[in-house]
Curated annotation (Swiss-Prot):
Gene for this chain: kup-1
Record's compositionally biased regions (Basic and acidic residues): 8-20, 339-351, 364-385
Region (Disordered): 1-20, 326-385
Protein name: Protein kup-1
């Protein structure tokens, strides 16, 4: 038959995929070209079957967001390993707990030494997405006592006015009077929730610009992260195994139909011991009503039908309601819908905070979707930037 499928071809179902490739993509090596074709065929198949990839929405970040994030932290290709983070304050956690903390963003490897750890992710965009969804920029402040009855202020910062910004430990420090930090050194602020304000007199913080983890972290822990520098990455990778614990994390087999990985994150809810709870996915019975305010409509009772007798009446009687000729399915209550396993994150609006200077876009330029990003030299994946 002329319309019979060619099962000997790898691309028989979507024969037009190769025609959609650009000239630059056609010049790529065969293995990378095959990867692009496979990905586009997968997208086309999902679209044909109406499969929506909603589980990875938290991984989507734009070029502008990534550029603004790196600018705020001071990271670049020249000084940082952009697929890895450096975490400080994880002395009470083992490698598995650290991996589980970032599980929704596809961590690959974990190295831990004393109270610091380095986590390498699958792609650079995963690191950016994790930072924007799981952390907030740290703002350093220093408290100063209020003046006493005689008007004297007992402080080493007598020459510095309140609110003045100073440079200490490669970061900005603001002087504020009468600070009241909590046990972790964090100062609560109702006016500004874009930053985590930390009193450096109450908590010692390493040099540089850091972001404070706000998701999947026990209440009694203070964990800060940033991009790992090139020197830190080389030191951690080449260290003796007796000093540095290394954990290789399996990626898990992504299901074509469910897009779920075998590495699952927790609920961001912790017990008294500080352990994060997780759902029992095998016996999960969470259900919900889609509309609680749904009006109750009284059913009009139909007159009782004539009882049917004859061949098949007994065998098929379960189809009808008791003493009625109407189908039993018409009288049953609908089954409640099950909650979907969506990742609930609130992304840091870093582009708005930094303004238009964070990422200059030429007039007329249109940012393409994440799957159609341009190929940068030296990247292993077209989506990596």
């Amino acid at each position: 038959m002329d319309d019979e499928l060619d099962y000997g071809s790898d691309h028989s179902i979507h024969g037009d995929v190769r025609e959609d490739l650009s000239d630059s993509e056609l010049q790529l090596p065969k293995d990378r070209l095959d990867a692009i074709i496979d990905r586009k065929e997968k997208i086309a198949t999902e679209k044909a079957f109406g499969i929506n990839d909603s589980s990875d929405k938290h991984l989507n970040v734009s070029i502008a967001e990534t550029a603004a994030l790196r600018k705020e932290i001071g990271a670049s290709d020249q000084n940082s390993h952009l697929d890895s983070i450096y975490a400080h304050g994880v002395e009470a956690m083992d490698e598995f707990e650290i991996q589980k903390m970032f599980a929704n963003f596809r961590p690959e490897k974990v190295w831990k030494k004393d109270n610091v750890a380095m986590v390498q992710f699958q792609y650079r965009r995963d690191v950016a997405a994790m930072m924007l969804n799981m952390s907030k920029m740290m703002r350093r402040v220093r408290g100063r006592k209020k003046a006493d009855e005689e008007g004297e202020v007992l402080s080493d910062d007598d020459d510095v006015e309140e609110g003045q910004i100073m440079q200490e430990k490669d970061d900005d420090v603001e002087l504020i009077e009468d600070l009241k930090p909590n046990e972790k050194g964090i100062v609560a602020s109702e006016k500004n929730n874009e930053f985590i304000t930390v009193d450096i007199n109450a908590r010692e913080v390493p040099n540089g610009k850091w972001r404070v983890l706000t998701k999947h972290v026990p209440a009694n822990m203070f964990v800060i992260i940033r991009y790992a520098t090139t020197d830190e990455y080389q030191t951690m990778v080449t260290s003796d195994r007796s000093q540095v614990k290394k954990t290789g994390v399996k990626r898990g087999n992504d299901s074509f139909w469910t897009h779920e990985s075998s590495n699952r994150g927790g609920l961001n809810v912790f017990d008294k011991e500080g352990k994060e709870l997780e759902w029992d996915y095998e016996h999960d019975t969470r259900f919900y009503n889609e509309d609680k305010n749904e009006e109750k409509v009284e059913k009009v009772k139909l007159p009782q039908g004539i009882k049917i007798k004859g061949r098949g009446a007994v065998k098929c009687g379960f189809l009808f309601g008791e003493g009625s000729s109407s189908l039993a399915s018409d009288d049953t209550t609908p089954v409640k819908k099950r909650r979907t396993d969506e990742k609930d994150y609130e992304k840091d609006d870093i582009v708005s905070r930094q303004g238009s200077s964070a990422h200059a876009i030429r007039p007329g330029r249109v940012e393409r979707p994440i799957r159609e990003r341009i190929q940068f030299p030296g990247r292993e994946d077209p989506d990596e930037y």
